[in-house]
Amino acid sequence: MTKTELRNKYKQKRKELTRIDIEEKSIAIANLVLKLDIWHHTYYHIFLSIEQQKEVDTDLLLHVLQGKDKQVVISQSNFKDYSLKHILLTDSTPVKLNKFNIPEPQDGIEVPTEKIDVVFVPLLAYDNHGNRIGYGKGFYDRFLKNCKDDVVKIGLSFFKP
């Protein structure tokens, strides 16, 4: 299958998920993440879910991270060069939907990519070798390439490879 075919297949699978499916699967994913040996790190990058894309609901993980007093980092998308700017999430960080309905920080304290210890990666599709397919713009490919060598990457998906 081509990347486009895989992308379409998994977008369709997501469309078929009900709100209850998303909630139950997101809770199961959060419970799996809680069991991982990742909680000694400081900076955790998490994506804020795009509801219309039926992504894994990261609100649960966000609450876990905040409950463990971790430094939570979210990103702002630059659609001119397909890069991400990373912002520390605080109680005063304004978050709004951009024109593509992606929740993003409007401004705040910028965090350099090399400070990030753990990245929760949105997965549309993936394989057993760590290859992923996203929405096709390469935001996360560029971001992950610039992370430090020992960054912990945790892919979040409703579906197995």
Where are these regions (language model features)?
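N-terminal active-site beta-alpha-beta segment that forms phosphate/nucleotide-binding
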Residues: 1-103, 109-114
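Conserved phosphate- and dinucleotide-binding cores of soluble alpha/beta proteins
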Residues: 80-161
